[in-house]
Amino acid sequence: MIKRKMDSLKTCFFGGYDKLDTLKYIDTITSEIYMLESAIEKKKNGDNFVIPGETGQRKLKGSALGGFAKPDVDSYICALLGKAAELREKLCS
């Protein structure tokens, strides 16, 4: 599981990442994690499974006013991508 518990993302008055773009990206990675976990479970049970496509890193849109704080978002996304990579490695081994 993700080591750092993230209850919320901090916002900032100026700068940061666009909120909607950030949340969409987090949702995409989280969906990939759920699909990987499901595939691992199917593999354990001997069922057919499909390896989901890899999301990978992408550049988030910036925000002039009221975006999410970059350090928090970067840390959280890094943790999510790490979890996805760990699950993908487990599935492919």
For each predicted feature, which ranges?
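Acidic, negatively charged sequence signal
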Residues: M1-S93
